[in-house]
Amino acid sequence: MATLTNGQVDAAVHGGAASTNGLVNGISHTHSPASCATIPMKDHDAIKLFIGQIPRNLDEKDLRPLFEEFGKIYELTVLKDRFTGMHKGCAFLTYCARESALKAQTALHEQKTLPGMNRPIQVKPADSESRGEDRKLFVGMLNKQQCEDDVRRLFESFGSIEECTILRGPDGNSKGCAFVKYSTHAEAQAAISALHGSQTMPGASSSLVVKFADTDKERTIRRMQQMAGQMGIFNPMALQFGAYGAYAQVQQQAALMASVGQGGYLSPMAAFAAAQMQHMATINGLPGAPMTPTSGGSTPPGITAPTVTSIPSPISVNGFTGLPPPQANGQAPAEAMFTNGIHPYPVLQEVVFREDSEKGGLGVAQRSCFGVQGSCFLSSLSEAQSPTAADPLQQAYAGVQQYAAFPAAYGQISQAFPQPPPIIPQQQREGPEGCNLFIYHLPQEFGDGELMQMFLPFGNVISSKVFVDRATNQSKCFGFVSFDNPGSAQAAIQSMNGFQIGMKRLKVQLKRPKDANRPY
């Protein structure tokens, strides 16, 4: 290579040597924003525009003639995928003068449709331009008879209004709210200070509301929170704290035993609460969870363990009887299965108090499942026994069973809430075939925890992983989510593919099999 005579190698090595064919000089000029004679300068208040709905076959050189008629261009960049290099159908444009950007926006935004596109071109300030300088206001509690001109007259004394739009329903009637956009942040702030809560419009239920409009990111977060709330993510009743319910049930029933042992009779309200304890747990979707004994022994000392073939009937106290739990297809109660696939053998399933009306005494029959399938403890007290005779039995339940319930309760609660740092071990766990999703265009700030929270509404997420650049420790904006069944994965694809977060739309699709050339 050193023997070449045209100087190409020397020019490439030394980065500036003159070449006889001018090749190096030609390359160096293609990357400059303009020729050496005229380097463009932009105003300090120049606006960076986002251009959307442009054909993917048009490059910078093809778009320049369209925008140059409104003023001198400082920078025009077509956005391309950093992984695939493909055209994204949008661009960023910065004029040297602010007025040129405003003219281009007025003339082109949703006014012209480029060849091959179904929607008109979008020309508006980029998010980064408005993030630090909010100018758009939300106005609420307006009179529904007011039109745009009335709203303009109300706000025009505080500055120049660029946009004024009243929100209307499908029938065309006003919703009593509007958006007002000023040319500067200071004008918008002045309108808020002067008008917010200052008066009550005719027909409005409260005073005028004037505040900055939500950003795209805030609206996206609110939509996700609403969706999560509807799906029950943040509702403790949907997390199936069966063990926690069993722990509370143990404590309440131990208190009932103590009150019966001391007074011999329960108040009607306490008796009714005891009778409905199991029924409320059933209708709330909180069946008692199976408990594992904390010690090696399966029964407390001095108590025999006869076999019981079925789960006892609901509580009956002072004549109040709880509703029986529902059974599907005539299945036996002892073999019932809940949605989490666990057999319902709850701690302290039944406490029965019988009042002997003839002798005026008190009989207590008590059954307690102790976490062993089909094995329960049965102990009975005759009506001749004194209240103090129940103390050993009471101590057995109060001192052993409530502590047996607590570890499993704590374990289920800790598993139900997603833990941010170590949600997944170092290695990505995968679900069955057809249950693993590839997610692209994630926000830069999303981690494993946020990714899991976003997909929890669609089913049981067994793992979530956002890939991070090892050198910079920054997110690569893509990751994987694994469900335990294909139905949840398909539901997530249908709902989240194309879901917009900020300026990007999520790409959600099934992960390719391991034998494929690429994982996505």
Curated annotation (Swiss-Prot):
Keyword Magnesium in record: no
UniProt keyword list: Cytoplasm, mRNA processing, Nucleus, Repeat, RNA-binding
Domain RRM, chain residue ranges per copy: 47-128, 135-215, 435-513
UniProt subcellular location: Nucleus; Cytoplasm
Family per record: Belongs to the CELF/BRUNOL family.
Task of the protein: RNA-binding protein that may be implicated in the regulation of pre-mRNA alternative splicing.
Name of protein: CUGBP Elav-like family member 4
Gene that this sequence comes from: celf4
